[in-house]
Amino acid sequence: MTKIPMQPADSTPATFHPNAPTKTNILGMNQEQLGAYFKHIGEKPFRATQVMKWIYQHGVTDFAQMTNLSKGLREKLSEQACIELPEVMHKEFSEDGTRKWVFKVAGGSLVETVLIPADDSKVNGRKTLCISSQVGCALDCSFCSTGKQGFERDLTAAEIIGQLWVANASYMEGVDSTEWQNNVTNVVMMGMGEPLLNYTPVVSSMGLMLSDHAYGLSKRRVTLSTSGVVPKMYELYKDIDVALAISLHAPNDELRNELVPINKKYPLSELIAAAKAYVHDNNPRHKKHVTIEYVMLAGVNDSDEHAQQLVALLDGLPSKINLIPFNPFPHAPYDRSSNNRIHAFSNILNNAGFVCTIRQTRGDDIDAACGQLVGQVADRTRRSAKWQQSIKQRAANEQQSEG
């Protein structure tokens, strides 16, 4: 059974507050939390599963429409509770079928979510949702635009699971059907933020994704991507059974310290050990490998020697390698590796016995590709101002050095 940690008492708005003057947002509560809420308001805890099915399997956010609840309970919930979704500020559609939403969350901050269909011509084909876990990111990876925006705050479980709810709802717009359909088939925690630095809300949200009373996704269809928060990796496989991806991007500590600064705290030896533990100590039926993500930066990490170092580093770790062509952003200090270089790098890995794929860039025309999520639309946050100031300072320094 999946173990879902309870959210801390101050994790608003997805947590029940008995003395709060406003309505309690029950979106994002897991079965245990929602059962406790119903018990507090004088109702049977089993009502939790009924309400969860209405919210996540039928797309209902109006208590009055939850017809298997008594009229009295529906009225009580309408008075005391709410199902508050993140506000859609903007949405864009790419020519390749990719969709991007910009959400406004509590406090006015903006986060982005991306849905990538495997083939937009197939109504029932694979649709992968890339979900954000934080407003901005504190890790400051040098090749990622999100990190350059700085960190503002963690998202709540309601704000995380709400992204999935809205994505499913968007597919129902204009559909001639009286039945709700959950069209998202895969979820990847690869959007804005480092998921393991927002541990409890992220794990609780993934629990809803897996729960038979909510979305009921397969464990193999929910993936968490981490840059390497090693202590939390050891906790993760004890708390929930999902697929793991590692944002590696370099085959040695010297280079990874530059590209992924968290490596200075948790070096590659510790990261790979944690990944091996995740594979071998967890249920082997569901954890046959981890996915290794590796962005291809021209002249930085894409040489034959780097590929050979990567082969040695991953020895003994069941893994699949996903090479990601770099997606440029304004003032990025890197260029994308050439297609020939990427394929040569891939061939070395394949010849060494690894399964290596090259990610197809999707959604780059709407700034929805990997590494491009920054909440650009109507972004007036402190993060944006800080980034703009750094650009001006860099330009001033360059002019000064030229002079």
From Swiss-Prot:
Keyword set, alphabetical order: 4Fe-4S, Cytoplasm, Disulfide bond, Iron, Iron-sulfur, Metal-binding, Methyltransferase, rRNA processing, S-adenosyl-L-methionine, Transferase, tRNA processing
GO molecular-function term, one example from the UniProt record: rRNA binding
Gene3D superfamilies the UniProt entry points to: 1.10.150.530, Aldolase class I
Catalytic activity reported: adenosine(2503) in 23S rRNA + 2 reduced [2Fe-2S]-[ferredoxin] + 2 S-adenosyl-L-methionine = 2-methyladenosine(2503) in 23S rRNA + 5'-deoxyadenosine + L-methionine + 2 oxidized [2Fe-2S]-[ferredoxin] + S-adenosyl-L-homocysteine; adenosine(37) in tRNA + 2 reduced [2Fe-2S]-[ferredoxin] + 2 S-adenosyl-L-methionine = 2-methyladenosine(37) in tRNA + 5'-deoxyadenosine + L-methionine + 2 oxidized [2Fe-2S]-[ferredoxin] + S-adenosyl-L-homocysteine
EC numbers, comma separated: 2.1.1.192
Needed co-factor(s): [4Fe-4S] cluster
Location in or out of the cell: Cytoplasm
Binding site for S-adenosyl-L-methionine: 193-194, 225, 247-249, 327
BP-aspect Gene Ontology terms: rRNA base methylation; tRNA methylation
Disulfide linkage: 130-370
Pfam families: Radical_SAM, RlmN_N
Keyword Iron-sulfur part of the UniProt annotation: yes
One GO location term (cellular component): cytoplasm
Top enzyme class: transferase
S-adenosyl-L-methionine as UniProt keyword: yes
Region span, Disordered: 1-25
Binding site for [4Fe-4S] cluster: 137, 141, 144
Domain Radical SAM core as annotated: residue spans: 123-364
Similarity comment text for this entry: Belongs to the radical SAM superfamily. RlmN family.
NCBIfam families: rRNA_mod_RlmN (TIGR00048)
Stored HAMAP family: RNA_methyltr_RlmN
Note: Reaction proceeds by a ping-pong mechanism involving intermediate methylation of a conserved cysteine residue.
Protein name, UniProt field: Dual-specificity RNA methyltransferase RlmN
Gene behind this protein: rlmN
